[in-house]
Amino acid sequence: MKNEPPKVIIAMKPSLLVLIDGMPQMGDVPGTKLRSVINSRSIILYDNEKELYYLRVQDWWLQAKVIEGPWEYAKKLSDAMKKAEEIVASQNDGQNPEGGQTTQQPSLKGSKKKVEFAETPAVYVAFEPTEMIETKGEPTYSQIQGTNLKYVVNTTGNIFRRADGEYYMLLSGRWFKGGTLDGPWTFVAATDMPTDFAKIPKDNPKAVVLASVPGTPEAKEALIANSIPQTATITRSEAKLTVQYDGEPSFVPIQGTSMSYAKNTSAAVIKAFDDYYCVEAGVWFKAASPEGPWVVADTVPAQTYNIPPSSPLHNVTYVKGYNSTLDVVHVGYTSGYYGTVVSASTNTVVFGTGWYYPP
């Protein structure tokens, strides 16, 4: 697994983090002349005529001249934007930018035609792996009894400060340390973890981090839970799979193996020799063609389980078939299939391989 620190933003007022997988890739919005950013989970539109970007925040829109901001509330929408709003509302009802906190919404005062807007939240647009931790104002600290640690009280994140002034932060199960809250941050290996963290009392609000402290009973329990497979019995005749490609199936090599995977589909399709394999909902399927027809697989090539963490298909290595009959196949997967894996550096459960998979 990889343990490089992401970019970290400490936000001390209501803020939104908008993640884009690399530089913006644009697509057409059906029925309009607008464009949309297709490589982001956030709803971002671009109006060519007005030369403005629009970002949807709950039921409202922010606008900016450049995608990095600054952003402000859009007080008047064009007819094209109103039409686009209907489209995206039906397709993405309730969707928010990932990592974003719920911020104060515009309020109606006096006449129904007059809208008074709340303060615009700070919007951070990131094109690389980024984490944001929001505090309610300047950080305030509380001492953890029996340790030399203090933790930040006014945040939902996990930030600690030692007596020597060094900061520790838990992100996706990994520990990072820095001399200030502005960083730079470095990964903390198990051998460098201060012993004070294992002494956090179980009744302390921050006892939840004990599952990520190497060697603690909580960390050992998490390892056991992570290794227990979720099993199912799949009836062959009932299991169906259809794979959609963006154009003709296109395959790229999987490093460290003789296999390749389809890069133009959201499905995990692997080519091994003259056969094709695909994992869907924790079940292996097999076909003689990338378009199918697909049937439940009894076995998969051994090298499938050598797919490295650097590959976007590493998660399929946690899916297995145990045994089968003419009618059913017994399958199972451990938590790594959904991204909860074990870090060899700390022997603790972490979230994600730490690798960035470009779109």
Tell where the protein language model's regions lie, with residue ranges.
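N-terminal low-complexity segments enriched in Gly/Pro/Tyr/Ser
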Residues: M1-P359
